[in-house]
Swiss-Prot record:
SMART domains assigned to the protein according to its UniProt record, in alphabetical order: Lactamase_B (SM00849)
A Pfam family assignment: Lactamase_B
Stated family: Belongs to the metallo-beta-lactamase superfamily. Glyoxalase II family.
GO MF annotation list: hydroxyacylglutathione hydrolase activity; metal ion binding
Gene from which this protein is expressed: gloB
Organism in which the protein naturally occurs: Neisseria meningitidis serogroup A / serotype 4A (strain DSM 15465 / Z2491)
Family annotation (InterPro entries): Clx_II_MBL (IPR035680), Glyoxalase_II_hydrolase (IPR050110), HAGH_C (IPR032282), Hydroxyacylglutathione_Hdrlase (IPR017782), Metallo-B-lactamas (IPR001279), RibonucZ/Hydroxyglut_hydro (IPR036866)
Record protein name field: Hydroxyacylglutathione hydrolase
Documented EC number(s): 3.1.2.6
Cofactor descriptive note: Binds 2 Zn(2+) ions per subunit.
Keyword Iron-sulfur among UniProt keywords: no
Entry keyword set: Hydrolase, Metal-binding, Zinc
Catalytic function, reaction form: an S-(2-hydroxyacyl)glutathione + H2O = a 2-hydroxy carboxylate + glutathione + H(+)
Cofactor: Zn(2+)
Chain residues that bind Zn(2+) 1: H52, H54, H107, D128
Length: 250
């Protein structure tokens, strides 16, 4: 199985998963890049997976379905183009992989991640929940939901690969360095991120550089407390403070 990012819009990635001469597309913001990829690689679209109902994630799903009407569109009931409604725990297959749907709200009140388990490990297509060195903004969800989604991700094996839908890594790492200026892993990752695409990323890597997965680290908590000017008594409070600080960070 081969997984390829296809650039779309300004900073979106549409993830294309190939098995044989069939492919899945994840979060098609627009149809043209997907269609070009399929034609160039002589592939048939087998499935479309949508994580949440924002135009830059579902915008191309309806057009793709019209072009490949035997190709199901998976998504929750608020995904207009969905032909196969999913909920937490829904399972299906693609190629030799097993797909499990997780509810990972926070960015939006209903947000799906797709966990693809293959012989080489777990691949998580996480939309706008987790970014490398960062997390999604809270729109219609809650910070408590987003924190819980991160805690669930953090219980996966450390070699799990995450496939976010945006390349925000360099900006996120600059904020992470603001929180942990002495973290050598962040400095190394930032130098690399300025030169090349960074995704996917392992959970092991994110545990070293993502402040939103490091809320129990004393240096992170202390820095957040210093910046917000108050005591933070739990991982959730540190997480919420970091999200507010990131919102204001330039």
């Amino acid at each position: 199985m081969k997984i390829t990012p296809v650039k779309a819009l300004t900073d979106n990635y549409i993830w294309m998963i190939q098995h044989g001469n069939h492919a899945v597309c994840v979060d098609p913001s627009e149809p043209s890049p997907v269609l070009e990829f399929l034609v160039r690689n002589r592939l048939m679209l087998a499935q479309t997976w949508v994580t949440h109902p924002h135009p830059d994630h579902e915008g191309g799903a309806a057009a793709l379905w019209r072009g490949y009407m035997e190709s199901p569109v998976y998504g929750e009931s608020d995904i207009e183009a969905a032909t196969h409604t999913v909920t937490a725990g829904t399972q299906f297959t693609f190629g030799d992989g097993q797909v499990t749907v997780w509810a990972t709200p926070g960015h939006t009140d209903r947000h799906t991640s797709y966990l693809l388990e293959t012989s080489d490990g777990i691949h998580v297509f996480c939309g706008d929940t987790l970014f490398s060195a960062g997390c999604g903004r809270v729109f219609t969800g809650t910070i408590e939901q987003l924190y819980d989604s991160f805690q669930r991700f953090n219980r996966l094996p450390e070699n799990t690969l995450f496939y976010p839908a945006h390349e925000y890594t360099a900006a996120n790492l600059r904020f992470a360095a603001h929180i942990e200026p002495d973290n050598a892993d962040i400095q190394t990752a930032l130098k690399a991120a300025e030169r090349t695409p960074t995704l996917p990323v392992t959970l092991a890597h994110e545990r070293r550089v993502n402040p939103f997965l490091r809320t129990e680290i004393p240096a992170v908590r202390q820095r957040a407390e210093a910046l917000v000017g108050k005591t933070l008594n739990s991982g959730l409070e540190v997480f919420a403070a970091l999200r507010e600080l990131k919102n204001a960070y330039c």
